[in-house]
Structure formats: C-alpha cells, structure tokens
C-alpha cells in the first residue's frame, strides 16, 4: 500500500527551527501563557489587573503581560508567567480558557517585516485595527507587533503551524 505521508514535508522541530533570509528572521516563541477570555472584559480587567482593551492588528504590545483584542467581547491574555486566574466561568461575567497548547506563536523580526506582511495579507500595516484577528497566508491568525515596529507575533492554531512555516519558507520576501 502506498504511503501517502511521503508527499508531505516533515514538520520542523519548532523548539530549535529558525528561518533567516535577507533581513527577516522567523522563530517560534515558546513559553508564553495564553488565556482566551470571553464575556465582560471590564470584569476581567478588574480581576486580572490588566487594563485596556488589548492591542489590535499592527499595534505594538509591550511588557511581560498584555492583551490581544480578538472581538468586542474577547481577548487573548498573553504573559511570560502564569496568570492568577483559574480557567472556567467566573460569576463576574467572563469565561477563561487556557490556550497554551492550542495556539502556536511565531515571532518575525527584521526591517523587511512590512514586505512580509504585505505578501501575507491585504491589511494596511500603517493603519492599526482594533482587532488582531486577520487572514494571513490563508490562515486565521492573531497579528500584532511586539516591542517595536520591526518585530511581530503571529498566534495560529497549532495544527496550522506546519503549513504557515512552509508558507514562510517559500515566501519570496524572506
């Protein structure tokens, strides 16, 4: 019987894999705690101590803990340390779901980041959006900048990470 798995490329070992072509580099950003928060975001902010509505596509996130805006009533809380909020429904009117294993995070950095963004999406990188949820290379991702304008993070469903990695390998801007 034919082995159909032979026609697909092997998934990279994301813990060590890096791409670097020209002035853009891509790597996996591991070790982040990710919580999907749905519901009353004002109550979430009070309980978590994270203020604001979260960054949207193209906006710059900073700090050890921050929020990424997905929709009017939904954010992804991201942090280097675990959050002191338990998963599940909270009587204050919000629900928390741990997404650490569900979302893969790529960090893309370099002066040609704008060209890569233009290649992957129709988003105008000069016009930040309230929501970080965009279609990038045909996959739904959360896109925002981190720390400065030449570094971005993409959160993608873990099952789509090998596809997005292959797309990034073949992108002519890299």
Set out the residue ranges of the language-model regions.
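Basic, glycine/lysine-rich polyanion-binding surfaces/domains
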Residues: 1-174
């Amino acid at each position: 019987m034919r082995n159909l798995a032979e026609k697909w490329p092997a998934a990279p070992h994301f813990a060590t894999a890096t791409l670097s072509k020209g002035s853009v580099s891509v790597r996996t950003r591991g070790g982040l705690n990710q919580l999907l928060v749905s519901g009353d975001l004002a109550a979430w902010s009070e309980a978590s101590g994270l203020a604001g509505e979260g960054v949207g596509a193209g906006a710059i996130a900073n700090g050890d803990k921050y929020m990424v805006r997905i929709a009017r009533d939904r954010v992804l809380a991201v942090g280097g340390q675990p959050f002191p909020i338990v998963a599940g429904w909270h009587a204050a009117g919000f629900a928390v779901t741990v997404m650490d294993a569900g979302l893969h995070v790529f960090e893309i950095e370099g002066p040609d980041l704008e060209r890569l963004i233009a290649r992957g999406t129709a988003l105008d990188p000069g016009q930040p959006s309230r929501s970080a949820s965009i279609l990038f290379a045909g996959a739904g991702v959360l896109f925002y900048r981190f720390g400065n304008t030449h570094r971005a993070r993409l959160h993608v469903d873990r099952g789509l990470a090998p596809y997005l990695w292959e797309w990034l390998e073949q992108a002519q801007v890299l």
